[in-house]
Amino acid sequence: MRSIIVIGGGAAGLMAAIKAAEQGASVTLLEANEKPGKKLLATGNGRCNFTNVVQEKQYYRGSDPEYAWQILQQFPMQDTLQFFSRLGIYARNRNGWLYPNSDQAAAVLEVLLMEASHRKVKIKTRESVCEILPGSEGWSVKTKTWEYGADAVIVACGSPASNVEGATDWG
């Protein structure tokens, strides 16, 4: 069985961990905060704007908007809607911004954590990653307290795009 470490316990990290586990991988998710999903709870003023109807290249900013656009083409809006509806989260359209019907970011986090648990994703909190190194048989991921080994590593730790507690250069 392939082992995968996911760095980051936000929406992207949880979704990556779930998708990897669905494919049969043994997944460990490392989250620096005391709980996963801390920044997720703040999205959309606590309502969780989880995708948008209009996704066009000109709406993405940053040092490499083309790269963001390419990534989004691999998991478009319809795939996002299917992923969440399979977990029982249905979208409400508000002027092109899609929110869960409940208008609660906490509901989105809850179903992501439930699915991760169902898929046997091991979630390690308060694990701040310091170093990622290639090894002879995969990867070594060092935290302040432990060293983990895996066949592959997914870095999904976001960014300090907003002044939200827990945001660092590592996400």
Place the predicted regions along the sequence by residue.
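Mobile, glycine/GP-rich and aromatic-enriched active-site lid/loop segments adjacent to catalytic centers
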Residues: 86-111, 118
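Glycine-rich active-site loop/strand segments that organize a redox cofactor
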Residues: 45-95
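Beta1/beta-strand and adjacent pyrophosphate-binding region of the FAD-binding site
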Residues: 1-12, 28
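Predominantly flavin-linked oxidoreductase catalytic cores and closely associated redox partners
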Residues: 106-107, 111-171
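Short glycine/serine/threonine-rich phosphate/pyrophosphate-binding segments
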Residues: 13-15, 157
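Glycine-rich FAD pyrophosphate-binding loop
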Residues: 5, 21-45
